[in-house]
């Protein structure tokens, strides 16, 4: 899901909730198998969003990815085949941020507690929460099983990766006048061609080994002047830690 008219990052839509599709990577490359052991697939009989494992029993995703029942699939690369080493664990608790706004996508973050702890190994491991916020120009890695086409649909079986920079607040806000809150940032390329897309929603943006972003929304995918918009995880570290401790 991408959101925002298709905003396509996570599947909802900020201005016009037009499409509840999830996002996928456009213009990226197939990730090295099991090289992103923190990446999870959220499954409801089908892949619908991504997420990030932050400890053995908790996953960070996007609030717009909420479903009442979710199975978290860890250790995945080809989501259409059981390759061996995957772990499928049902969600015990699904907690959206209390201030999430489905119209604006502000506070688009959600925590999922696994029914039982994941077994951590070379294929399934955690990503660190940010120690500080990312800065403009920082190179990051976005990943997911979302749509790979900016026009049309092609959902990949294999996890896709995209290397992309954090954009300045000014260029982000000028791309989406009046829609970027202090809890959002843009990442990608103003010239278009590379972006997250439907199906990538909820998935990770990792910069220097830290989870800085969650795929949230955008206007279409990989459109010129319309970069992807991401939830700024650094603003939620306290909420995440407090929620995990209380549940």
Swiss-Prot record:
Site (Required for specificity): 195
Pfam families xref list: Trypsin (PF00089)
Segments forming domain Peptidase S1: 25-245
GO cellular component, one term: extracellular space
Maturation-removed propeptide residues: 16-24
Family: Belongs to the peptidase S1 family.
Protein name as it appears in the record: Cationic trypsin-3
